[in-house]
Swiss-Prot record:
Residues 1-31 form the signal peptide. Glycans are attached at residues 54, 79, 206, 225, 242, 265, 308. Forms heterodimers with IL17RC; the heterodimer binds IL17A and IL17F homodimers as well as the heterodimer formed by IL17A and IL17F. Forms complexes with 2:1 binding stoichiometry: two receptor chains for one interleukin molecule. IL17A homodimer preferentially drives the formation of IL17RA-IL17RC heterodimeric receptor complex, whereas IL17F homodimer forms predominantly complexes with IL17RC homodimer. (Microbial infection) Interacts with SARS coronavirus-2/SARS-CoV-2 virus protein ORF8. It comes from Mus musculus. InterPro entries: IL-17_rcpt-like, IL17R_fnIII_D1, IL17RA/B_FnIII-like_1_sf, IL17RA/B_FnIII-like_2_sf, SEFIR_dom. Keywords: Adaptive immunity, Cell membrane, Disulfide bond, Glycoprotein, Host-virus interaction, Immunity, Inflammatory response, Innate immunity, Membrane, Phosphoprotein, Receptor, Signal, Transmembrane, Transmembrane helix. It holds the Pfam family SEFIR. Induction: Up-regulated in brain upon West Nile virus infection. The keyword Cytoplasm does not apply. This is Interleukin-17 receptor A. Residues 807-817 have a biased composition (Acidic residues). Residues 778-824 are annotated as: Disordered.
Length: 864
């Protein structure tokens, strides 16, 4: 609420006074409450000394509240009266009168505060009655009045009487208010005030309007005794409507003093329409006291009334004869057109009715087949994005892709079908290629939702849930392709124009709509195979429903997809996975490696898995021993250990890497029982009856793959784990010396020492010796990782420099002449350092993260 702090009679300072004077000059017509300057207000009574002074509407009791305060006034009476100022001007003033209550609170009454608030401008004016003496009880009720608030016509005010001191904020109010409305200058009492007289309240323009002819109108009025411009407004209406059909404004310049109270006239040119005859004339003065808000005087001129004595001539007297002929011709044409239209509509409706009742197909609302042209089907391509939750679910995805290819003629991009390409180009490159190809060819991306998709989506969002690492993703060479695909897909879901590229589906029976991530709630979700027909129309970019027709693919409607062999296989795969879910309700938690606590799932029952994809440890194990060269009189003996309990097949293929022209040699295979062959032994040449020797004898006693590196007429060491159930230390043909026998450990240490000596002496690599160490017991997956690691890293068994293949044993001995020997203490220190570097290299290899390499002991880390 705005607070007015000063008025013309109260000037706190010269700067504020000049500011108020400037505001009064800039806005002379602004209405605001003020105090009457004459006579001075008096509040003293018999038995009371009182003084009236201007107030800022902020009493000290608000800042320093008191405990005891007086009660509110008893009654308030407000009257409007007219008073004269010191200059003789008549102004409207408010007469405020109130009485006190007859209680003990008058003993604490220190005064009263009167305030007037102008409601339209929110300006407030306050005065304060300050009691200089204490009130005493007497026989009459104390009564006070104040008649010095000057108000303006047509304004609304709120008058408040507040006893002092004011109460505390939570105390009972001790004030009363009343609202009063001041009439405008049309009131008989207010018309005589100076403000109303200056705004023309006593001016009677005596407006007269005269119609000169049908096109001109003259307005006369009397001027007022002020040199001010006038404006005459004319607005015309029709006799039956309130909408203006014509308006015009005329200006009259300010008259001279001798022209005051004289008549002025202005002429208007009317509208050309004779029906625009109802006129409304207004005269607006621009007096200095009111400017644009001065009272307008108006007069209305109705349309002229046609006299009954004036009989108009018949219209027929003015119409020529040819008009009658034209009207008759138009009437005949209209009637003929209506007749022809009725005949045509009748004929058309009868023909349509015959067609409708003559064809049974049309009775059912189906158009003839000959009249419909089915939309053309084009070969399309889709990319299937899924999460490998379980081997059975992967089988369902494969069967679904097979159904799309065989039954629907749709090309499918699936990671399981392009593992070789993914291994060549990488996961992200393959995913980005598929995404770009789908966008450029306007193809579709099918997203198959399952429990794994929901879990991986929550992992992408960073929810406080366990991490997701599914067992099938761990088996796949490419790993988790769903997360990589989602990272490529996410930006498209910020653009609504890209929503049509994606088709979100889930297999009903093994998945539910709860498995669909929240990201896809803005798109349609299709349960398979219930709504596969709609999915197929999405793939073809065709509308299934059109005005008056509905398209169907008979082979895909309902359960008709079971008529095709691929559809039946898909159904069987879904039922097989559904049965597995029923037997193992916690199958997903057990498939998640992060929740399985390192325990493997039990092997799946053969009754459930009739045709497993790649069960753990299953399949055909292919082992390729590397044969460098055989002499003409030598042969290679491959010994395969067959265990009666094993039901798998193992294939051992020798792969020859000749360095020069090969000579004829003999290859002999022998099958020995596993219990007759030791776990690890030094292989001795086997002399055959024809005199040739065997290169090596390798017993297959483990489920893993072994790749012995056989040298020319040399014995190889086969190192196995100490416990047959333990995994090897690493996936490369090297092991910690702790698991080697005494001879093998000495041979390995001699190899390290030889390498170190050759590096110190700067001899060529061709002079290095050729002892080799071969490990057995690596799984097929670890062997694949080993081959890739060997090709990329280069530091394992193949990183050991090998002498040229064409050197004989005597030439190698000549090249391997010993260098200057070192002291035993230096050799021991170098040997420990080489062993420490060897084990550190094993730990740094990225392909050994899942294994537990042996760390060097503190004594080995700090050689003496």
């Amino acid at each position: 609420m705005a607070i007015r702090r000063c008025w013309p009679r109260v000037v706190p300072g010269p700067a504020l006074g000049w500011l108020l004077l400037l505001l009064n000059v800039l806005a002379p017509g602004r209405a605001s409450p003020r105090l009457l300057d004459f006579p001075a207000p008096v509040c003293a009574q018999e038995g009371l000394s009182c003084r009236v002074k201007n107030s800022t509407c902020l009493d000290d009791s608000w800042i320093h509240p008191k405990n005891l305060t007086p009660s509110s006034p008893k009654n308030i009476y407000i009257n409007l009266s007219v008073s004269s100022t010191q200059h003789g001007e008549l102004v409207p003033v408010l007469h405020v009168e109130w009485t006190l209550q007859t209680d003990a609170s008058i003993l604490y009454l220190e005064g009263a505060e009167l305030s007037v608030l102008q409601l339209n401008t929110n300006e407030r004016l306050c005065v304060k009655f300050q009691f200089l003496s204490m009130l005493q009880h007497h026989r009459k009720r104390w009564r006070f009045s104040f008649s010095h608030f000057v108000v303006d016509p047509g304004q609304e005010y709120e008058v408040t009487v507040h006893h002092l001191p004011k109460p505390i904020p939570d105390g009972d109010p001790n004030h009363k208010s009343k609202i009063i409305f001041v009439p405008d200058c049309e009131d008989s009492k207010m018309k005589m005030t100076t403000s109303c007289v200056s705004s023309g309240s006593l001016w009677d323009p005596n407006i007269t309007v005269e119609t000169l002819d049908t096109q001109h109108l003259r307005v006369d009025f009397t001027l007022w005794n002020e040199s001010t411009p006038y404006q005459v407004l004319l607005e015309s209406f029709s006799d039956s409507e309130n909408h203006s059909c014509f308006d015009v404004v005329k200006q009259i310049f300010a008259p001279r003093q001798e022209e005051f109270h004289q008549r002025a006239n202005v002429t208007f040119t009317l509208s050309k329409f004779h029906w625009c005859c109802h006129h409304h004339v207004q005269v607006q003065p621009f007096f200095s006291s009111c400017l644009n808000d001065c009272l307008r005087h108006a007069v209305t001129v109705p349309c002229p009334v046609i006299s009954n004595t004036t009989v108009p001539k018949p219209v027929a007297d003015y119409i020529p004869l040819w008009v009658y002929g034209l009207i008759t011709l138009i009437a005949i044409l209209l009637v003929g057109s209506v007749i022809v239209l009725i005949i045509c509509m009748t004929w058309r409706l009868s023909g349509a009715d015959q067609e409708k009742h003559g064809d049974d197909s049309k009775i059912n609302g189906i158009l003839p087949v000959a009249d419909l042209t089915p939309p053309p089907l084009r070969p399309r391509k889709v990319w299937i994005v899924y999460s490998a939750d379980h081997p059975l679910y992967v089988e369902v995805v494969l069967k679904f892709a097979q159904f799309l290819i065989t039954a629907c003629g749709t090309e499918v991009a699936l990671d399981l079908l392009e593992e070789q390409v993914i291994s060549e180009v990488g996961v992200m490159t393959w995913v980005s290629r598929q995404k770009q190809e789908m966008v450029e060819s306007n193809s579709k991306i099918i997203i198959l939702c399952s429990r794994g998709t929901q879990a991986k989506w929550k992992a992408i969002l960073g929810w406080a849930e366990p991490a997701v690492q599914l067992r099938c993703d761990h088996w796949k060479p490419a790993g988790d392709l769903f997360t990589a695909a989602m990272n490529m897909i996410l930006p498209d879901f910020k653009r609504p124009a890209c929503f049509g590229t994606y088709v979100v589906c889930y297999f009903s029976g093994i998945c539910s709509e709860r498995d669909v991530p929240d990201l896809f709630n803005i798109t349609s979700r299709y349960p398979l195979m219930d709504r596969f027909e709609e999915v197929y129309f999405r793939i073809q970019d065709l509308e299934m429903f059109e005005p008056g027709r509905m398209h169907h693919v008979r082979e895909l409607t309902g359960d008709n997809y079971l008529q095709s062999p691929s559809g039946r296989q898909l159904k069987e795969a879904v039922l097989r996975f559904q049965e597995w879910q029923t037997q193992c309700p916690d199958w997903f938690e057990r498939e998640n490696l992060c929740l399985a606590d390192g325990q493997d799932l039990p092997s799946l029952d053969e009754e459930v898995f009739e045709d497993p994809l790649l069960p753990p440890g299953g399949g055909i194990v292919k082992q390729q021993p590397l044969v460098r060269e055989l002499p003409s009189d030598g042969c290679l003996v491959v010994d395969v250990c067959v265990s009666e309990e094993e039901s798998r097949m193992a294939k051992l293929d020798p792969q020859l890497w000749p360095q020069r022209e090969l000579v004829a040699h003999t290859l002999q295979s022998m099958v020995l029982p596993a219990e007759q062959v030791p776990a690890a032994h030094v292989v001795e040449p086997l002399h055959l009856p024809d005199g040739s020797g065997a290169a090596a004898q390798l017993p297959m006693t483990e489920d893993s793959e072994a790749c012995p590196l056989l040298g020319v007429q040399r014995n190889s060491i086969l190192c196995l784990p100490v416990d047959s159930d333990d995994l090897p230390l690493c996936s490369t043909p090297m092991m910690s010396p702790d698991h080697l026998q005494g001879d093998a450990r000495e041979q390995l240490e001699s190899l390290m020492l030889s390498v170190l000596q050759q590096s110190l002496s700067g001899q060529p690599l061709e002079s290095w010796p050729r002892p080799e160490v071969v490990l057995e017991g690596c799984t097929p997956s670890e062997e694949e990782q080993r081959q890739s690691v060997q090709s990329d890293q280069g530091y394992i068994s193949r990183s050991s420099p090998q002498p040229p293949e064409w050197l004989t044993e005597e030439e190698e001995l000549e090249l391997g002449e010993p260098v200057e020997s070192l002291s035993p203490e230096e050799l021991r220190s170098l040997r420990k350092l080489q062993r420490q570097l060897f084990f550190w290299e094993l730990e740094k290899n990225p392909g050994w993260n899942s294994l537990e390499p042996r760390r060097p002991t503190p004594e080995e880390q700090n050689p003496s």
